[in-house]
């Protein structure tokens, strides 16, 4: 009957049993713990009680209480989380005790339960990450503009006929034509001559040379036959205002 009670007391979260063993309050200082431990150790030492089994057990409990309460880190864990905190510190480390109790707190559990209910036990995450929308069957379409340039990195260098853009019977635009698909001839030779007139095409007419253009000097009003050597001003004097040419001073 004592073993279940001992296990239950060790895993308590109150943090009072070790202080009760030493007969001290939780506000006791380190010196008070040392003095009380020495008195109880001398009182229940096995050498003074050779045939007393209860005294031996009491001596073990006093030693355990002193080893925990004399360590400031373990004492803080015990004061906050009781014997259960000491057990968690032995399993996961003293630095992870606070994180363990935060994760297992009722508030965090309530948030997890609410998220599970809203998402249908995280069914949305499973469909997106694990099942990939039924092996890609219901996967959202990718950006369509990406497919327009997919032929640039194809391994065979040729595009199938169904990959060419359709323009309702019109010839493809220059920007839509793949330059790699243009045939340079039957033997692959480069083009060295201009294209000739095809049969049934429009006739070509030679245009006469342009006649000599006759202009008017804007400053003098005299007619001028303009050519490539004609200047805008036929006089050598630089004139900035036409009205001032005939002005007398």
UniProtKB/Swiss-Prot annotation:
PROSITE patterns: DNAJ_1 (PS00636), DNAJ_2 (PS50076). One of its GO terms (biological process) is synaptic vesicle exocytosis. The modification Phosphotyrosine is found at residue 19. The modification Phosphoserine is found at residues 12, 14, 17. May have an important role in presynaptic function. Residues 146-177, 218-249 are annotated as: Disordered. It is a lipid-anchor. CDD domains: DnaJ. Keywords: Chaperone, Lipoprotein, Membrane, Palmitate, Phosphoprotein. Residues 146-162 have a biased composition (Basic and acidic residues). GO terms for cellular component: plasma membrane; synaptic vesicle; terminal bouton; type Ib terminal bouton; type Is terminal bouton. This is DnaJ homolog subfamily C member 5 homolog. The lineage of its organism: Eukaryota, Metazoa, Ecdysozoa, Arthropoda, Hexapoda. SUPFAM superfamilies: Chaperone J-domain. Residues 227-241 have a biased composition (Polar residues). Fatty acylated. Heavily palmitoylated in the cysteine string motif. Its main location: membrane. Residues 15-84 form the J domain.
